[in-house]
Amino acid sequence: MSVSANAAQAHAQPSAVLRPVMILAGGTGGHIFPGLAVAKVLRARGVPVTWLGADGAMETRLVPQHDIPIDTLAISGLRGKGVVKLLGAPVRVMRAVRAAGFVLRKRQPRAVISFGGFAAGPGGLAARLLGAPLLVHEQNRAPGMTNKVLSRFARRVLTGFPGSFVGEEAVGNPVRAEIAALPAPADRLFGRTGPVRVLVLGGSQGARVLNQALPAALVALGHSEVEVRHQCGEKLRAEAEAAYAQAGVNASVEPFIADMAAAYAWADLVVCRAGASTLAELCAAGVGSVLVPFAAAVDDHQTRNAEYLVGANAAVLLKQDDSLPVRLQQVLQTLLADPARRLSMANAARTLAKPDAAERIADIILQEAGNGPSGMGNGHSSEQPQERTLMHADKRTDQVSVAAGAQLHTIPDSRFPIRTSTGGAR
């Protein structure tokens, strides 16, 4: 298996710089965006951040946009693989752990935090073996497999919802500051007149079931006093527009909403999936919701997420099945006619909010990192990053190499690379 690490960006630094915090996250926005939120807080405090992700995954496109150095491993998930690939998984994982160890020796992080994703497993195991302080943040109520494993030897286990782990610290999921700063629900919603404003969120990829169920439910209601704003994803935009047109429902269909704070402030009610980040935003904004969990989500984690809001009377949960349009019609009929119920749900959501989650996570990371030495060495590194670094494993010799410019240094196959006197690797 080839193992690669791409340093997407590196700055010229002084001879002695504060060692970074390393973030392990990738695969989906649900893992990446919380990591980016925490990275923003750390960098605002003068703490450098580096990232470890999976080769070719979403994080390789998103993280460099934020000017954060990223290394990647050639690793993928194990769920749903055939028997032959599963039998070879231990070898691939150990190679990935070895490559992750190389990255850690190169970056010399003062602390490592996993938000989940394919690369987080090897990265977390390497951090443990090298003695770097390891923390875990689990966004969902049903923990992912990687964070389940890493939680067993992490120094601190942080969660977005209570009840995910024994001994957890429920700090919440990070949300954008502009969403957390919205006025209280009563200030926005009390006495509001005109059509009821329904915001539909399908996520970055869109949600076909919502594209079909919302127009069908609204036309069955025959409710003219409804204003719909539907975020559907670029790929499903034409489909969503056609569904509303066929139903005779006037809706603003958008592939992407740039200003989510303004969208939440506009809405009287939200219809959406139940991803952890979306629910954190609903609570921070203080808005009631109708939640339709993604039926194929791993371990049905979206239903577990939704149940937390339902238990607080902040949301209504509808299962995704053939009866969804009828049940959605019934729920909307009740909620559209009851502004007091909508306000009550919004207030309940706001009581669940943890708007300072990113700050709290950053505080805990730095508590564990300390201001001095840790298992990875001194608190400062004299490493001089190259403009571009590539790591790969030679398939024939199973050796790990580092290419920096025109120079090539080969490392014999061993558990971890040899550390140079300057803090790099050779």
Curated annotation (Swiss-Prot):
It is a peripheral membrane protein. One of its GO terms (molecular function) is UDP-N-acetyl-D-glucosamine:N-acetylmuramoyl-L-alanyl-D-glutamyl-meso-2,6-diaminopimelyl-D-alanyl-D-alanine-diphosphoundecaprenol 4-beta-N-acetylglucosaminlytransferase activity. Keywords: Cell cycle, Cell division, Cell inner membrane, Cell membrane, Cell shape, Cell wall biogenesis/degradation, Glycosyltransferase, Membrane, Peptidoglycan synthesis, Transferase. Cell wall formation. Catalyzes the transfer of a GlcNAc subunit on undecaprenyl-pyrophosphoryl-MurNAc-pentapeptide (lipid intermediate I) to form undecaprenyl-pyrophosphoryl-MurNAc-(pentapeptide)GlcNAc (lipid intermediate II). Its EC number is 2.4.1.227. Its main location: membrane. HAMAP family: MurG. Belongs to the glycosyltransferase 28 family. MurG subfamily. SUPFAM superfamilies: UDP-Glycosyltransferase/glycogen phosphorylase (SSF53756). This is UDP-N-acetylglucosamine--N-acetylmuramyl-(pentapeptide) pyrophosphoryl-undecaprenol N-acetylglucosamine transferase. One of its GO terms (cellular component) is plasma membrane. It holds the Pfam family Glyco_tran_28_C. The keyword ATP-binding does not apply. It comes from Xanthomonas axonopodis pv. citri (strain 306). The gene is murG. It catalyses: di-trans,octa-cis-undecaprenyl diphospho-N-acetyl-alpha-D-muramoyl-L-alanyl-D-glutamyl-meso-2,6-diaminopimeloyl-D-alanyl-D-alanine + UDP-N-acetyl-alpha-D-glucosamine = di-trans,octa-cis-undecaprenyl diphospho-[N-acetyl-alpha-D-glucosaminyl-(1->4)]-N-acetyl-alpha-D-muramoyl-L-alanyl-D-glutamyl-meso-2,6-diaminopimeloyl-D-alanyl-D-alanine + UDP + H(+). It comes from the Bacteria. UDP-N-acetyl-alpha-D-glucosamine binds at T28, G29, G30, N140, R176, S204, I257, Q302.
